[in-house]
Amino acid sequence: MVETRNGTGTYVKRQISGNYMLNIVPIGDLQFEDIVEVLDFLCLIEDSVAAMAVQRCTQEELAELQAIHKRLIAAKDQNDLEALTNVDVEFHSKIAMITQNSLVVQTYALLLEFLQPVMHRTYVTLGAEEGIPYHERLIQAFCAHDAVSAKNVMGAHAQNR
């Protein structure tokens, strides 16, 4: 379960059994096929997660998401790919937290932990610009409380990885 506290953000109150979560993604070092499966799974859920988050987002959470995005831009401007990767993970994790759904939050935590090295390699290979336009359009959708737009943008972002 997650809890939203005015002025401080959203917090995980209760976690689902670890054994349940471990069955979602293969344990151990991910092979290429595992990474493809995780990315495919994210493509299935990320757009709906974004739509749900838009519908539940508070002004404070929107401000937090915007602050994370500003840090993402700063990392890109400094060409700090390590920070860029970490902040990108934080951005997607924040969207999961905004849903106020503990299963979404924990699933994202698990999947993003596995994918963080892949995300870093993507930034090294393709450059720091890859996700930023999508993030900017997502924030616009959040500002407009437009779940359909958020779903479309996140779907395109997930497919573009």
Residue ranges and their predicted role:
Residues G18, F32, C43, A63-Q66, ...:
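Amphipathic alpha-helical repeat elements characteristic of tetratricopeptide repeat
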Residues V54, A96-Q100, H120-Y123:
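Amphipathic alpha-helical interaction elements
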